[in-house]
Amino acid sequence: MYLYIETLKQRLDAINQLRVDRALAAMGPTFQKVYSLLPTLLHCHHPLMPGYLDGNVPHGVCLFTPNETQQDYLSEVEAKWGEPLQQSVGGELPITGVYSMGSTSSIGQCHTSDLDVWVCHQAWLDSEERNRLQEKCSLLEKWAASMGVEVSFFLIDENRFRHNASGSLGGEDCGSTQHILLLDEFYRSAVRLAGKRILWNMVPVEEENNYDDYVLSLYAQGVLTPNEWLDLGGLSTLSAEEYFGASLWQLYKSIDSPYKAVLKTLLLEAYSWEYPNSQLLAMEIKQRLHAGEIVAFGLDAYCMMLDRVTRYLTQINDTTRLNLVRRCFYLKVCEKLSRSPASVGWRREILSQLVSEWGWSDESLAVLDNRANWKIERVREAHNELLDAMMQSYRNLIRFARRNNLSVSASPQDIGVLTRKLYAAFEALPGKVTLVNPQISPDLSEEHLTFIHVPAGRANRAGWYLYNQAPSMDAIVSHQPLEYNRYLNKLVSWAYFNGLLTSKTRLHIKSANLCDTVKLQELVTDISHHFPLRLPAPTPKALYSPCEIRHLAIIVNLEHDPTAAFRNQVVHFDFRKLDVFSFGEQQQCLVGSIDLLYRNSWNEVRTLHFSGEQAVLEALKTILGKMHQDAAPPESVDVFCYSQHLRGLIRTRIQQLVSECIELRLSSTRQEPGRFKAVRVSGHTWGLFFERLSVSVQKLENAVEFYGAISNNKLHGLSIQVETDQIHLPPVVDGFASEGIIQFFFEGTADEKGFNIYILDESNRVEVYHHCEGSKEALVRDVSRFYSSSHDRFTYGSSFINFNLPQFYQIVQLDGRTQVIPFRSNTLSHLYIVDREPSQPAQQFQLH
C-alpha cells in the first residue's frame, strides 16, 4: 500500500509540475510574474507588497516553500525594507492551499484567458477574518488588473462542499445550481500553486462511495498524514435536479460567451444523457491516473472534455453539433494553423494532430483563422449555428426534466434569473433588435450602408431594405439585403447596436421623400450620443424583477412629416395659442409618425412605430403601458424631432407631455388614485386615465362622455344615460337644472351603503348612476382638475354656451324637506381657474 501511495504522489506531482510549466509557457512575462508571485503575496503580508491593508489580516499558506523566482522577489523586498521579513512557518496556517483552475494550464488557455484562483482556507476562520482575507484578495485582483492580467479569487472554506453550501448568481461560482459539478471541474483542472496536495486524487474510483471511511483507513495505517492534505470531500452521486440546474447555468453563460460555453454545455448534456449511470469527467481522469494511463496529452482537462463530448455526439449521431464543438474548441485554443508560427509550441502540436484526425481542409482552417475579420454575413451564420446548438441543448434539457419528473433544486430565484436571461437574449419578438455578435468577431463595421425604401404596390414587400454596399445598381442587384423591416428606425437601430454602423460608415438612402441623407445622419448621431453600445450585464436583481424602460428615445416625424407641406405656403396661426397637436384653423396634428427606441433593464433593445393622427396617443399609451406602477422612472427620456418646420416647438411639447404623463403614471395610487390627463389632438379631446394596472384612452366628445369615462374609472355602480323627458328626476334637481353649466348632484341611498349621482351637462342632458361605491371627493377632484387644466378642450362644434367650472351639490333632508346644498370638500379649495386671454386675430406667417 505504501509503495502504491508513493507512486500516486509522484504521478500527481509530475502532472502538477507539467501543468505549471504549461500555464507559464504560452504566456507573456507579465502573466508569468503574476502567476508565480500569487502564492508569495498570500503567504506574506507586508506594506511593500501588493494586497497589503492595515489590521489583522489572515495570511500564510500551509507547507509553502518559495521557489527560486519567489525567493528572488522576497529578497528584493527585504533589500528595500532593510531587514528580514517575518514569515509564517510550520503548523496549520490560515490558508490551506492556493490553486488555479479552469482553462489555465490546459490547451484551452490562451493569451486572453483570465485566471481563476481558489484560496482554500481553514474552517476555523471567523466571519471577520474571512472578510479581511477577501479584502486582501480584492486588492490583489486590482494589482493584477493594473498589469493587464484578469484574476478572480474565490475563498473556499475547506468544509464548504461537505455542507452543500453555495454562492449565488451574482458571482462566478454559479449559484445554487452547481455543487458537485463545481467540485468536479476543480478536481479535473486544479493546479496546485502552493499548499497541501488534494486528497481526493488518492482515493480509488471504486472507493468513492466509501470515501470518508477509506480516507480514515489511510490515516489509521499511517500511509498518509492528515495535515498534509486538502480534503474537500468525495464526489457523491449527482441528482437529476443538479444536472438540470447546472445545465441552465451553462446556457446562461453561453449567451455572453457562446464559443467558450458550448463545450461545457454539451459535457453536461452528455452527463444527463448517461443519467443515472453518469461518470463525472474528474472520475474518469482519476481512474486513468491510478491505472497509469496518462492519455489525452497528459490528461489535459480540455482534451478530455472534448473526448467525452465527441463520444456522446457520435453515439447519438449528431454530426452537426460535433462539427460545431470542434470549431469552438479550435477557436478557443487560439492557434492559427493556416499561418506560419514564430515557434511551434505544445498547443500547436496537439491541435495539428486533432485537425488531421478530423480531416479539415486548408480552406476551413483559413476561414476560422480569419475570425477577427468576419463581417455580418459570417457572424450571423455562426450566431445561428450557436443558437441552434444551444436551443437543442435546452430542448434536451427540458426532455430530461420531464423524464425525471424534476423538482428543481436550484433556488426559484436563480431559475427565474436564468430563464429570463435566456428569454431576453433569444426570444425573437417584433420590434426587438437581435444582437448577433456575442464575442464572435471584434469588428462588424461597414464602410458603406445603403437604406432603400420600396413603396406599396411593388413586387417586393413594402418597407426598408439594408445593404452593405454603395448604392450602385450592379452592387444592389447582385446582393441580398442584410436586413428588412417595414420601418427605418428598426433598421438603423439594428445596424447601430450590432456594430455595423459607426462614425466612419458612409450612409446612403433612397426613398421617395420619406427621409433624406441629412435626416438619416441626424438620427444616427442622436442615437449614438444617447445610447452607449457597451453596458454592464443586467444584474440578477434586474432579471428577477419586471423589466423596466431604462433609456427611451421618442423619434418624431422621421418618416411622415406633416410640416413638409408648409414649404412656401402661407400658414395662419396664432403664436399665443400654438398647439402642435391641433394646429391652425384646420386643427391639424403636426405629428405624422412616432418611432420609439428604448433599452430596458434586461438590456433588450426594442423599437415600435406609430403613424397617422393618433400616433401621439398610441405612442403615449404604449410607453405608459410598459411602466408598471412601482417602476423606477427611466434614466433618460429624449425626444428627437426631424420636422422641416416648427421642430423646436414640437420637440418641446412632446417632451413636456411625455414627462407629465410618466409622472402621472408612476405616482398614481400612491397619492391620488385614478388621475387623468386631457390631450387635444386634431380638434378632438382625449382623456388618458391612469389606473393602478393600466392606462386607458377615451375620446371625450362632449361632457356626458367625459363623465361616463370618469365614472367608469372611479365608481362601481349601474350607469343609465337618459333624457329628461324619459325619467322623473328628483324634483329638487329639476328645480336646480340650469343651462350652460355642468352640475353634479349626490344623493345618499336608503341603506346608507352608497350613493346616487345625477349629472346634468350644459344642455341639461342627464346621466344617472345608481348605488355608487366610490369616493365622491375623488370624483370631484378629478372633474375639477380636468376643467381647470386647459383651454378649449372639446370640439368647436360642441354646444357649449358658457365654460364655467362644474358645480357640485349634495341632496339632503333638512327639517323633513329635501334640499340641495353645495357639496363641501377640501378638494375644492385647490382649484384654480385659467383666465382665457381675449381673442386676437390670427397672424399670417410664410414658412420656407
Swiss-Prot record:
| Keyword Glycoprotein appears in the UniProt entry | no
Instruction: Give one GO term, molecular function aspect.
Output: ATP binding
Q: What is its EC number?
A: 4.6.1.1
Give start-end of the signal peptide.
none
Q: What is its main location?
A: cytoplasm
User: What InterPro entries does UniProt report for this protein, alphabetically?
Assistant: Adenylate_cyclase_1, Adenylate_cyclase_1_CS, Adenylate_cyclase_1_N
Query: What reaction is this protein's catalytic activity?
Result: ATP = 3',5'-cyclic AMP + diphosphate
Q: What class of enzyme is it?
A: lyase
Chain intervals for the UniProt region annotation (Catalytic): 1-535
Q: Does the keyword Transferase apply?
A: no
One cellular-component annotation, GO: cytoplasm
Biological processes annotated in GO? cAMP biosynthetic process
UniProt entry keywords in alphabetical sequence: ATP-binding, cAMP biosynthesis, Cytoplasm, Lyase, Nucleotide-binding
**Activity regulation remarks:** The regulatory domain is involved in the regulation of cyclase activity by the carbon source.
What sections of the sequence does the record tag as coiled-coil?
A: none
Q: Where does it localize?
A: Cytoplasm
Q: Where is this region: Regulatory?
A: 541-848
The record's section on PANTHER family has: ADENYLATE CYCLASE
Question: According to its UniProt record, which protein family does this protein belong to?
Answer: Belongs to the adenylyl cyclase class-1 family.
Q: What's this protein's name?
A: Adenylate cyclase
Organism listed in the record: Yersinia intermedia
